[in-house]
């Protein structure tokens, strides 16, 4: 296994703000969750190696990425994986992930823009801007958005939001904050 500093020596020389803006070993940047130590970097390198089928490939194909996501129990369509790749590439390419892009995807934290985007569908239903919607609205929102969530998954989300049994409401601000915390800990 190669050392993390050897992955791409010119990454830190690239312009700031680019997906590859930070060096791999011990980098710290506003878009990342924090310093990435050698152990975490080695684990990510191993994960990348596994996803490339143990080959010394420079890219995880979109098909292998789709298979890996499905093997984790996430039911996404090929188009959703392609959308993810477009976001990561920041253009229309959907051909797969190179290691620096994989690192960005696996270590990027949730920022305020992402949190605002998560709030947007709820705010459409919450005309009074109270921060809560009914459990019925919550369930309908997920069904209408095309999410294939089970009743148990919706219940887990409602528990994260600390729903009130008496009031039959979901505090979506609490839910979004809890999800952001959980995602940033991953």
UniProtKB/Swiss-Prot annotation:
It comes from the Eukaryota. Ca(2+) 1 binds at residue 98. This is EF-hand protein 5. GO terms for molecular function: calcium ion binding. The keyword ATP-binding does not apply. This protein has four EF-hand homolog domains, two of which may be functional calcium-binding sites. Ca(2+) 2 binds at residues 126, 130. One of its GO terms (cellular component) is myosin II complex. Residues 41-76, 77-112, 113-148, 149-186 form the EF-hand domain. Keywords: Calcium, Metal-binding, Repeat. The keyword Manganese does not apply. Residues 1-23 are annotated as: Disordered.
